[in-house]
Amino acid sequence: MPNQFETQFDIDAFLKHLTERPGVYLMYDASGQIIYVGKAKNLKRRVSSYFKKRHEEIKTETLVSQVASIEVTVTDTESEALILENTLIKRHKPRYNILFRDDKSYPYIFVSTGKKFPSLSYHRGAKRKVGRYFGPFPNASAVHQTLHALQKIFPVRQCTESVFNHRSRPCLQYQIKRCSGPCVEGLVTEAEYNEDVQHTIAFLEGKSFDVIESLGHKMQQASDEFEFEKAALYRDKISALRAIQSQHLINQPGSKDTDVVALAEEANQVCVSIMMYRGGNLWGSQNYFPKIGGQSINPGEIISAFITQHYIDLPIPQMILVSDVLEDKSSLETWLSEQKKAKVSIRKAVSQTHKGLMKLALTNAQSGLKQQLTQKASQAERVKSLQDVLALASPPNHMECFDISHTQGNQTVASCVVFNEGVPNTSAYRKFNIEGIQPGDDYAAMHQAITRRYSRVKKEGLPLPDLIVIDGGKGQLNKAIDVFKTLELDNLPLVSVAKGEGRKAGLEILYTPFNEEGIDLEADDIALHLLNYIRDEAHRFAITSHRSRRQKAQTHSRLEDIPGVGAKTRHKLLTHFGGLTEVKNAAVSELQKVPGISARIAQTIYDFFHGEI
C-alpha cells in the first residue's frame, strides 16, 4: 500500500509511463483506503479515461475527486486480470465497487454411488465423500423440494450410513412408500434398488425424457407379461415425471444448461435474480441485492460484476441469458470458457422460449425488489423508533448484543450478534469460550466477553457500534459500564433488556446508564419488538454455540482417553456408529467391523467402556 501519501501524486507523470498491457488498478484515497478496484485490457487507455475533462456519470466524477494514488498490477491476459480484480474486490470491499453478498457455499444433492445401496442426501461444503454431486442449487429450499419430489417417484433411501447400518426393521419412510427398505433383507433386490438409483441420477443429469422412455418400455414389458400391478407402478412414475416437466418452461430433450440473469431497479436499489436450469429442469432461483457504492445505476455493469463474482468458484453453465447489454461481454465469455474448458455464450433473449425464461426472471427480480424495499422501510421505522425511545443522537444502525449460555456453569459461552440497519449480519457474529471464572457467574462471563470484544475493536481501530444491547438487568448493565470505563470507551450508548414480571414477552424493562428507573414500553411497541428480536437472536446463537461446545466435550473427551486410539480411529468410530452412546454399547465383534480396527483395539475400546481399564 502507498506510504500514507506523504508526497503529491503526479497523475500526468503516472499516466505517461503506464503500460498498455492488461492488468488491475487500485485507487486509493488520502487516508490510504482502497476505494475502487478495476480491470483493463489496456491499463494506459482505461486509467487515462478517468482523468479526461468531463464525465457523464456523477459517480465517476466523485470517485476521481477522491483519488490520491493509483497502483497497478500487470497480468498476462485479460482473464487473469478479471480473476485478480474479483479477488481484490472480495478482500477489500472498496466503497465504489459493486459488491454482491459472498455465499460461503452452495448446496448440492449427493448420491453415495460407492455404496452397495446408495443414498440420496443434501450436501453443503467440501466434496470429500466418494460419489456424485449434483448442483449447485441456489438455496437449501430448492434442494429439499427436489429431494422430496424424487423420493415420491424413486424410493431411494435418504438416511445416514450410521442409521442404515443399524436398522433391523424398516422405518416410517418405508411404510409411507418413500423408501424401498434396502436396510432389511428381502424387501428389495440390489438390482431393483439400483434401477431406481440410476433413474434418479439420469433425472438429476437432466435426462428426464430418457427416464420416461425407459420406464415406458418397462411398463409395456410388464403389461405384455400380465404383471399389471408392476405396469401400474411404472405408469404412475411416468405421470409424476411428466407433471414435474410441465412445471418447467424448458422441457425439450437436449436443452443446454442455462442460467437466466435479470435485473430490476427502483428507488436507487437493485435486485439481480438468477434462475438455474439444468437439462431442462428449473433447479431454483435466488435474488441478490448488491451494494452499489452510491453510484448511478448501470444495469450492464452490475450484471457483469455479478457474473464475475458469482462464477469465480462455481460450475458454469453452457449459456447465460442476460436482461441487459454487457460492454465486456466478449472478455467475460473468454474468461468463462477458459474456466469451464468449453464454450460458454452470454446472450440476450431472442427466441420465444428464451423470452419466456427472461420474462419469468424479470418478474422474479421485480417482486424480490418490492419485497426488499417494503422490508427496509419497516426496518428503518423500527430503528428510528428505538432511537427516539432511547434518546440517541443518531439512528442505531450498527447494534451489537451479548448473551451467556452454560449448563450448571460448565462450557460457558458468550455470544455477540451484530445487526446492521435492523437486519442480522451473521458473518460478523462472534462467540467467546469463557474460561477462568467461577462456574455459573454470569456477571464475570459478561465482563470477560465484553472486555475481549472491545479490547480488540479498540486495538484494531474497527468501527464501534451505535448501540450495545445487554441481555439482563441493572447488574449486567453496570458490569458493561465498568468495562467501557476501563477501556476509555464510556461514551458508547448502552441498553440492557430485563425480563419483566413472570418473564413474559412484552413486559421487559429497559435500563440505560442515564435512566436507572427503567423504561417500560407497551407490548406492541415496534422499538421493543426490535430489541426483543436482537436479544432472542443473541440467545439463540449463545445456546447453539454452547451446545456445540458441550457436545464436543462429551463426545470426544472419553474417546481421547482410550489408550492406542488416535484421532483417525475416533473419527472412524463416530462415523460408523453415529455417536458415543452407540460406540459404548457396541460388542467387540461390532467394533471389529469398523475399517482399521483390529481385534486388539476393539477389545481395548470395549474394556474401556465396561470398566476393565
UniProtKB/Swiss-Prot annotation:
Domain GIY-YIG: 20-98
Keyword Calcium: no
CDD domains, per the entry: GIY-YIG_UvrC_Cho (cd10434)
CC per GO annotation: cytoplasm; excinuclease repair complex
Domain UVR: 209-244
Broad class of where this protein is predominantly found: cytoplasm
Keywords in alphabetical order: Cytoplasm, DNA damage, DNA excision, DNA repair, Excision nuclease, SOS response
One example GO MF annotation: DNA binding
Pfam family, one: HHH_5
UniProt-annotated location(s): Cytoplasm
BP GO terms, sorted: nucleotide-excision repair; SOS response
Family to which the UniProt record says this protein belongs: Belongs to the UvrC family.
NCBIfam families: PRK00558.1-5, uvrC
Function: The UvrABC repair system catalyzes the recognition and processing of DNA lesions. UvrC both incises the 5' and 3' sides of the lesion. The N-terminal half is responsible for the 3' incision and the C-terminal half is responsible for the 5' incision.
Subunit structure: Interacts with UvrB in an incision complex.
Protein name: UvrABC system protein C
Organism: Hydrogenovibrio crunogenus (strain DSM 25203 / XCL-2)
